[in-house]
């Protein structure tokens, strides 16, 4: 091998290493620590870091502090972390693992500007193959249309465990609507365990006064395995009430 060729190879390797390091640095700046792996999850300490979960939807996360969104400003309002997206949308659905670590998220409003008919409005939005655990939501307000829940919208092949929702509301004013105090329409092998909702208002009623399709305290509709969950003091308005 000629000397110049060797130098080119070394330079190429160095540039590749710098590129990888740059990408890692950019991602690490989004969170309080971690690399997003199962053994080293991204650490969340602020509202902005929680918002940045959408940048790595398939990774592992751990909440390290209570979050209060009362003064958190986001142009257009909160948009769910997971989205259906265009095409099959697989890269936009939340498929990671979020461990709330016993902490609380409070005073979040999931309503995207004036788009009251937005689908899958919730905190996490579309969850496909993901896991959410050990989390409390307090005073969360969700307004939209289509598939709604306070924690998640459309939920498929997911695991939801030890999640509580209190003092919150979910108002679906679209047509053909679903609304839930915890999880929106479910599909696949979704399993919900040791969860509860209390003092929540759940409503599904379209703008033309027609009642919505389904509401529920834990899940609005679809197929899911629900174990050791309970719902207290919720109100609803829909044709099919699944409490």
Residue ranges and their predicted role:
Residues 2-13:
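Bacterial N-terminal signal peptides that target proteins for export
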């Amino acid at each position: 091998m000629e000397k110049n060729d060797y130098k080119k190879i070394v330079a190429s390797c160095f540039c590749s290493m710098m590129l990888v390091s740059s990408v890692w640095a950019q991602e690490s700046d989004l969170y309080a620590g971690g690399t997003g792996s199962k053994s080293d999850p991204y650490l969340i300490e602020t509202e902005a870091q929680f918002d940045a979960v959408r940048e790595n939807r398939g990774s592992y996360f751990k909440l390290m502090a209570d979050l209060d969104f009362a003064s958190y400003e986001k142009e257009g309002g909160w948009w769910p972390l997971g989205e259906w997206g265009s095409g099959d949308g697989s890269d936009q659905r939340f498929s990671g693992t979020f461990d709330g670590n016993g902490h609380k998220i409070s005073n979040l409003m999931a309503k995207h500007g004036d788009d009251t008919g937005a689908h899958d409005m919730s905190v996490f939005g579309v969850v496909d193959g993901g896991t959410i655990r050990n989390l409390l939501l307090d005073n969360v307000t969700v307004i939209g249309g289509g598939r709604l829940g306070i924690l998640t919208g459309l939920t498929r092949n997911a695991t939801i465990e030890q999640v509580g929702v209190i003092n919150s509301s979910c108002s679906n004013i679209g047509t053909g609507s679903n609304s839930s105090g915890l999880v929106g329409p479910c599909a696949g092998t979704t399993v919900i365990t040791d969860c509860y909702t209390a003092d929540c208002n759940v409503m599904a009623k379209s703008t033309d006064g027609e009642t919505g399709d389904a509401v529920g305290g834990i899940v609005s509709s679809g197929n899911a395995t629900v174990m050791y969950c309970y719902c207290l003091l919720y109100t609803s308005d829909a044709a099919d009430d699944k409490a």
